[in-house]
Amino acid sequence: GRARAIETGELHIDVAFIAAPTCDKYGNINGVQGKSACGSLGYAMPDAEYAEQVVAVTDGLVSVPLEYVSIPQTQVDYIVEVESIGDPSGIATGSIRISKNPAELVISKYVAEVIKYAGLLKEGIIFQFGSGGIAISAAGFVQTEMQRTGIKAAAGIGGASGFLTEMLANGYIGTFFDPQDFDTKAIESLYFNSRHHEISASAYANPFSANPYVNLLDVAVLSATEVDINFNVNVLTDSYGKLIGAPGGHPDAAAGAEAVSYTHLRD
């Protein structure tokens, strides 16, 4: 919704300050290099394109033009160099792994079985798995079934984790379209794997675009805090009203995918 609002002019941005892990002296930006690498800058792309003025704030200023460009110099008005744009340890080191919690593994197995027996796990499937331990574990069970049957996914869409990018590297996923990254393995994949593509938040889920990527999804597996018997989903609070989560691509995936499976939010 936000990307749509920016592009239609409903949300006007006077100045966009964009954290740039790497920026050359001409204003080209990427998020896959530098000490503060964060991966895809998909959610900053609409801001850079439509803001009246764009300021790149970087702790990785380089003198030569960047080979990998997420946001081009034509959209950047000013560059500000600072000592640090943030703490990269806030991004999971390595890759988010399959859960070892027995209860979560049971739920993950059920999720994978639902996907299988609903007839969704077929050659050319397009899927999205969230960053929670259960979602990643479900992806692991799905991969096991893919190994058994020889099924290959046409594409993965949405936030990228190390586990999903390993599936990409090993040929279980044909290509990946990525508006954000969850761990350092995913960041490395985006930089080095030519089948791993950075996309904007608008390309991912703008309902006003001709065909947002979420509309291609066969199935999405995401985290939730509560789900009632009528399939209404809460991703913000626990049963006592305490904020413990946030909606990411949940509404978008729910609108676009053929089927959505929600798991409980990882602590």
Residue ranges and their predicted role:
Residues R2-E10, A19-A20, S40-D47, P65-S70, ...:
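A generic local secondary-structure boundary/capping motif
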Residues A37-E52, Q147-S161, V235-Y262:
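Gly/Ser/Thr-rich active-site loops/lids in small-molecule metabolic enzymes
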